[in-house]
Amino acid sequence: MKLENLNIIIADDHPLFRNALRQALSLSFANTTWFEADSGDALQQVLDKPTVGFDLVLLDLQMPGSHGYSTLIHLRTHYPELPVVVISAHEDINTISRAIHYGGSGFIPKSASMDTLKDALTAVLFGDIWLPNGTEIIPIEDDATDQMASKLSDLTPQQYKVLQMFAEGLLNKQIAYDLGVSEATIKAHATAIFRKLGVRNRTQAVIALQQLEMDKLDLT
């Protein structure tokens, strides 16, 4: 595999960071096309491009709409061949271990040098798992969170998008307008979401989603 002519997504809500990352990596990965997303919803819109085959996602766990590890879980379920590298300002062993536990192909601290970043992405693009030097992954034993992660993975991309919009506090009518579908369609999605998550209403569904957020896992 030649590391050129790649399609790489940078999903982070800080435009200065995205720009710096893109400029630095462009020197190492020739003729790469860079796609950017500043939220979980924007990331899904990029992934929905039917004519683009993506090679890598660089994912910030805390951008708006990401809900911690839930977007990572969603990506691993619906895009299993697409490597996802987590880039985070949180560098503690619990954060790193959960990122790998939920399917990340690597973890890069935002404090890493550009040389380290280049080496990490090269390793992942060649099929390896990359971790900071000296990192020893700890086992994650959290049955309740793992069960919710499994339930979230059952949601279709559209259902996951609707659940994210529930978390933003949008009404069914607003969601229907934004997605260009009928309100009845949103109600049908809601019913399916509640069933798959084992909850009874929107509030419980949002609480379920929040179980995968970093601060709910005492990782801040």
Language model features with spans:
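Active-site beta3 strand of CheY-like receiver
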Residues: V52-L58
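Active-site residues of response regulator receiver
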Residues: D60-L61, S88
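Acidic catalytic/metal-coordinating carboxylates
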Residues: S39, H67-S70
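The feature encodes the CheY-like receiver
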Residues: P64
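Short, flexible helix-to-coil linker/hinge segments that flank and couple to helix-turn-helix
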Residues: S97-I100, P109-L152, K161, M214
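Short amphipathic alpha-helix used as the core "switch/output" element in two-component signaling
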Residues: Y69-E81
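Recognition helix of helix-turn-helix DNA-binding domains
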Residues: G169-Q204
